[in-house]
Amino acid sequence: MPNNALLQIKQDTLNLIDDLKVICTSFGLGNDGNEYKIITQCFLYKFLCDKFEFFFEEEFPDRTIRDYKDFKKEEKDIFFSILYDKRLPKLAYDDLLSYLFEKHFNDNDLHLQLDAIFNRISNNNATLFNTTSTDKTTIALFESVSQYINEESKRANFTRVLLDKLKNFNFKQAFSSLQNQQGYDFFAPIFEYLLKDYNNAGGGKYAEYYTPLSIASIIAKLLINEPTQSVKIYDPSAGTGTLLMALAHQIGTDSCTLYAQDISQKSLRMLKLNLILNDLTHSLKNAIEGNTLTNPYHSKNYKGKMDYIVSNPPFKLDFSNEHAEISQNKNDFFLGVPNIPKNDKSKMPVYTLFFQHCLNMLNNKGKGAIVAPTGFISAKSGIENKIVRHLVDERLVYGVICMPSQVFANTGTNVSIIFFKKTPSTNEVVLIDASKLGEEYTENKNKKTRLRESDIDLILETFQNKTQKANFSALVSFDEIREKNYSLNPGQYFIIEDTSEKISQAEFENLMQQYSSEFTSLFDESQSLQQEILETLGNLNYD
């Protein structure tokens, strides 16, 4: 399929998301806490139905989906085994959206029919789709949606309007065009668009941070610079999974297993959708809901075993209630735990704990990247300074990129990306000041910054080739960093260039004569103007 056709499908998908949001608003659910549940579940339901039908038509090119309802048990069992091998769900004919339109679209209990379908799909595919929390609570893929409309009389019509929008859209065209390429490039911007109204955390809430695709892509490309097979990748503050998806795409979805944890129920729901859209259903069981700092689920089996770790943790958070418990864990937080401040507890630098956790989880050949406030890289005190000193003294850090302000949607804080390893293997550190790159734009009356393709290429080329560029990048030794009081700020190492020009004695005298002549002319003009003004004032009369 030509690119312009694929672009049209992408635009149609974005329009579908907008339509679903408009419907929710018209039924009183605009900006409601449950709106995202309805939209993500309906979007996922349509995706799974279309994927099921697409695969059915590939397996049985001489039959239509209507023939599926007459399949005997033996035929279904064989078909289901093929589906399971491909990590696709088992759906009965009466689970499909087409069946709802065929049999129940005008029913007064249509909402109950959809709820029942969601429950059946979840139960019949529990092994494939269920996830868990740190306390072993099972979290199903779907839940009933009609409950979110308070007025029972509106539930059937609300469901009817939603399904009507779903019916008029078809993912199958996208599947056919993406057969020979990964779907990440198609679905990533769609997922980003889906998220934009549900990720307004204001920079302060736990696990609601969203990493822009451009930043996620830079991190993935700088971490993975050679073919990689059978690796474990981990994000302890996974959010909606943007960093993990970019890394998995760079590695290859069949060559990696994802591990994730996040405390936010909303983020985990979005993360599961992201995994399914990106053919990473095999890693769903590793997406855990829970507090990474007090109950790091994956530490039990994979501490010191992760090949790659990425993280964009919350920067500041009040964790005073968990402070005592966290402080007892001297192994995970070996460099210490920030003190509880007397005044504003919401400013506790929680990211320092995630950083230490990441260092613990890497294997000996592992590499990682974490997003942190730019102030961290030149911290002179506190746990921040202890971490920087550890990274430098142990020669673990190998790169820092200072990003432009306002490049992250939910925080005005200047941020940097720190690249690190588990085992010392480098003698120099690449420091890049990309803070002046990008272009400004306005979204919802807020000024933001985005990186252009040329900006991304410049960052990648400079980092990978360890190129030194005036006022942009520096390649420094660990001894130099110690001499600069452990600062990882690129600007500390830029050489101020002497831009003055050398001139001869004769040229100097000529310039002085020229300047003298110009000033004399200006003074003469000034005196003439002064005389003219005085004469004019003298000629003024009182009438």
Residue ranges and their predicted role:
Residues M1-D85, N539-D543:
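Non-catalytic accessory regions of SAM-dependent methyltransferases
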Residues P2-A5, K303-D543:
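A conserved structural/catalytic subdomain of Rossmann-like adenosyl-cofactor enzymes
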Residues D18, G33-C42, I139, R160, ...:
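Non-catalytic, well-ordered alpha-helical scaffold segments
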Residues D18-K21, K167, F191-N199, A220-I224, ...:
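Amphipathic, well-packed alpha-helical segments that form the structural scaffold of globular domains
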Residues N34, S81-R87, S425-A434:
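A structural motif corresponding to the C-terminal lobe/cap of the Radical SAM core domain
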Residues D50-N199:
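Long recognition/docking surfaces used for binding and targeting
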Residues N200-G204:
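Conserved adenine-nucleotide phosphate-binding loops and their immediately adjacent elements
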Residues K205-S311, K316-Q328, A372-G375, N385-V388, ...:
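Conserved S-adenosyl-L-methionine
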